[in-house]
């Protein structure tokens, strides 16, 4: 089991390290806001560009495709670069993609620009978390990772509603321009606060690829792709569930999204705390909790006062993120950059798999709440992969 090599930054004061973590988290906030903002602006984009809302859905898919393609590709291409330089280049690419999206004249260029904006997503998070972990002692590495991921969860709670409000009252183009400005702010903060590390351990593209012949890496990625799908299965259909099952007005939907974001913040912190104490066993506890939450959700959906706590609990399932991310750093000796970036590609597979499975069931005539049962099945699938990973780990130690 390996850990990121201690960096020169470990000699920095706690205050300096906190500023670096805040700079890295700001990048996560920019990415999270850019990824989720369009979901609340689909009608605005459709009306402005003269296309249907399902066509705007393809814009979301283009971004996700960019993440899946860019995470491993850019991690490999940047393997020999200093991490500080790579972070700056990745965030510059993200800023460019969002400014271009804001200026897209028609639908087709917007598809291309969202794909470009998605390319640096996974690689940025992967490298940022390696930097954060390298500054922390072994028993606090998952907590450091969760601080970087906190930017993403705060984006769900604050950034997404802010961008949606800006897009509705001015133009959806201003929402993407705002994301670009936040990305430029991240570039400035990383350039100022993150020092160059001449002793940083470098990897090679061939070394990164060669390390991917180990089963623990693929099992960890599988746990993310399958185990996380349940959260996305339910969350993607939250609005129609509230309207048609809970039978509340559309004004409650932003409140529900904020409750979900609050759950994400709690879950993100809890995931890092658990993994620092339980290591791989934390993944099993999180997946078991996820299964329980998803099984309860269909029963909680019929009342506003029961579905809101259920939505909060759904958000806490994001605890799987920092736990799996840190586990990958442990098992991916020689391929930590590629593995950390690929973890976000796996999460985007979950983001596609969950809604697709839920959509199949709903299109077949089942109730909106069936998403909870389907999600529970995927969480159980993640537990099966955990059992396999646990067996492999015990056999090699």
Which sequence ranges carry the predicted segments?
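A late C-terminal transmembrane helix in Major Facilitator Superfamily
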Residues: 331-367, 374-375
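Helix-to-loop junctions at the C-terminal end of transmembrane segments
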Residues: 71-82, 267-279, 362-363
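Cytoplasmic helix-loop-helix junction between adjacent transmembrane helices
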Residues: 113-151
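Paired small-residue
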Residues: 93, 97-100, 108-117, 305-313
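Helix-loop-helix hairpin linking two adjacent transmembrane segments in secondary transporters
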Residues: 107-109, 137-192, 241
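Helix-breaking motifs and short loop linkers at transmembrane-helix boundaries and internal kinks
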Residues: 50, 82, 103-109, 247, ...
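C-terminal transmembrane helical hairpin of 12-TM major facilitator-type secondary transporters
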Residues: 281-324
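Conserved MFS/SLC helix-loop-helix module at the cytosolic interface between two early adjacent transmembrane helices
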Residues: 69-108
